[in-house]
């Protein structure tokens, strides 16, 4: 997975796990500024929750939900880059570990190639 740049690091709280590579977060930007953002996991492509990949996609989503239940706190590292649907791209950290990397290691996603 290639490195993101420039990088910004924020504390965030999970409000929804959309699928295996997208979450909705309340991002603490500092100075009492909280933003709702949909974050697409940078550099990974999880299986889709619809169509032929549905079963694997639901497993990927559950993997993320188990690690990031609603209300869980995490760290999001992001840049100015947005994905094709306008979502910020980010790397999510739980207890210092990259969720993006965990998805790849556990076989719930592949390296994003597009």
Predicted feature locations:
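Small beta-barrel nucleic-acid-binding modules, primarily SNase/OB-fold domains
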Residues: 1-114
